[in-house]
């Protein structure tokens, strides 16, 4: 029997009186059971920013489905709106001294802590393995694509993108002929960064001030097919 399923003695959850759902009380109970906050226009959990609310809606539905109420989809939407208010925190600053990974957290001083106890702004979908062998396939690929002196620069730039900081004020442009394999760098980065990376257009960002909103909470933006003409303005890109 489900945890909150109605029983003959009417032991109902405190947020359901048998006919109506109290959304505020539901959210209070939900937050006692689930580690989640709302900040800067997004939900965050120990897995990082919630980019798809369908699983969250599914969790809410599992708790509501025993209730004989009308229009459960609308009720779930209303609960999500109340949850934003109930779970809101005034400030959730980025942590620039650590990288959250699928199996723990790596500090920039080399210290690694296993587990995912804290709510974080971002978590990369890759595991930390201090004994991992050298990535020979990746190194051979870079050897065939770049000059030897350029490889450390690329590696350093990728490492810089792992932390939520723009203090370096740098953008990397990889220039070359078509068919050389440059796009494979973006494919590898997509695997490392997951939803923390966005495929975008530098031209669109430079021309549309609203395009920057798509980059909020994003660690890396990759333009895989940058236009050759000069940018009309660079104010939005620099900011």
Describe every region a protein language model picked out.
Residues 15-35, 129:
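Intein-associated homing endonuclease modules of the LAGLIDADG/DOD-type, together
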Residues 20-25, 190-195, 230-239:
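A short, contiguous, amphipathic alpha-helix enriched in charged residues
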Residues 16-20, 69-106:
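Extended, Lys/Arg-enriched charged tracts that mediate electrostatic binding to polyanionic substrates
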Residues 31-56, 95, 99-100, 105-220:
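P-loop NTPase catalytic core of nucleic-acid-dependent motor ATPases
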Residues 211-239:
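Conserved nucleotide-sensing/catalytic segment adjacent to the nucleotide-binding pocket
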Residues 74, 184, 231-235:
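Charged, alpha-helix-enriched surfaces in structured cytosolic catalytic cores
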Residues 14-15, 67-70, 146-150:
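Short, polar/flexible loop-turn hinges at active-site or ligand-entry regions and domain interfaces
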Residues 1-10, 42-74:
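Short, small/acidic-rich helices and loops at N termini and domain boundaries
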């Amino acid at each position: 029997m489900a945890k909150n399923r109605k029983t003959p003695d009417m032991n109902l959850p405190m947020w359901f009186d048998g006919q109506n759902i109290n959304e505020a009380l539901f959210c209070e109970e939900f937050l006692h059971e689930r580690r989640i906050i709302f900040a800067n226009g997004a939900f965050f959990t120990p897995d990082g920013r919630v980019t798809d609310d369908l699983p969250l809606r599914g969790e809410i539905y599992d708790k509501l489905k025993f209730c004989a109420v009308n229009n459960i989809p609308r009720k779930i939407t209303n609960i999500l709106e109340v949850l934003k208010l109930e779970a809101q925190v005034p400030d959730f600053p980025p942590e620039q001294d650590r990288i959250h990974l699928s199996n723990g957290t790596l500090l920039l001083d080399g210290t690694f802590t296993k587990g995912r106890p804290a709510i974080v702004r971002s978590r990369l979908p890759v595991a930390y393995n201090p004994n991992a062998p050298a990535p020979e396939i990746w190194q051979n690929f870079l050897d065939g694509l770049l000059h030897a002196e350029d490889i450390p620069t690329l590696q350093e730039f990728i490492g810089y993108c792992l932390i939520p900081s723009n203090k370096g004020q740098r953008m990397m442009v990889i220039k070359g002929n078509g068919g050389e394999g440059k796009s494979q760098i973006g494919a590898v980065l997509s695997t490392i960064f997951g939803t923390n990376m966005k495929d975008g257009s530098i031209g669109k960002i430079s021309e549309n001030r609203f395009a920057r909103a798509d980059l909020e909470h994003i660690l890396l933006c990759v333009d895989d097919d940058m236009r050759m003409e000069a940018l009309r303005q660079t104010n939005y890109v620099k900011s």
